[in-house]
Swiss-Prot record:
The gene is THSD8. This is Thrombospondin type-1 domain-containing protein 8. InterPro entries: TSP1_rpt, TSP1_rpt_sf. Residues 1-21 form the signal peptide. Residues 53-104 form the TSP type-1 domain. The keyword Membrane does not apply. It comes from Homo sapiens. Keywords: Signal.
């Protein structure tokens, strides 16, 4: 009795599957419905925030960019992550409109102080 090529491949594939260890990440255990989306996604986002907080330094002081009517502050990467971390620029630099009390050295036409 001749076997089909698919049947000949099935047995080795099943043995390979049984011999291959499964990778289970503890971060992705399902914890049930919490009413605010998928629990796995919440754990993943929490883990990413912990990694970012562990590798980023504190925010620096605000500095005036009065020619642009804005203030800027930044922070630096001070540690290393256990894996690749891709950060958006807003995690390293923040901008806000400048105010007269924050920029006493600026001339009135440099900033919109109504904000």
């Amino acid at each position: 009795m001749a076997r089909t090529p698919g049947a000949l491949l099935l047995a080795p594939l099943l043995l390979l599957q049984l011999a291959t260890p499964a990778l289970v990440y503890q971060d992705y255990q399902y914890l049930g419905q919490q009413g605010e989306g998928d629990s796995w996604e919440q754990l993943r986002l929490q883990h990413l925030k912990e990694v970012e907080d562990s590798i980023l330094g504190p925010w620096g002081k605000w500095r005036c960019l009065c020619d642009l009517g804005k203030q800027e502050r930044s922070r630096e990467v001070v540690g290393t992550a256990p894996g690749p971390v891709f950060m958006d620029p807003e995690k390293l630099i923040q901008l806000r409109p400048c105010r007269q009390r924050d920029c006493p050295s600026c001339k009135p036409f440099d900033c919109d102080w109504r904000l």
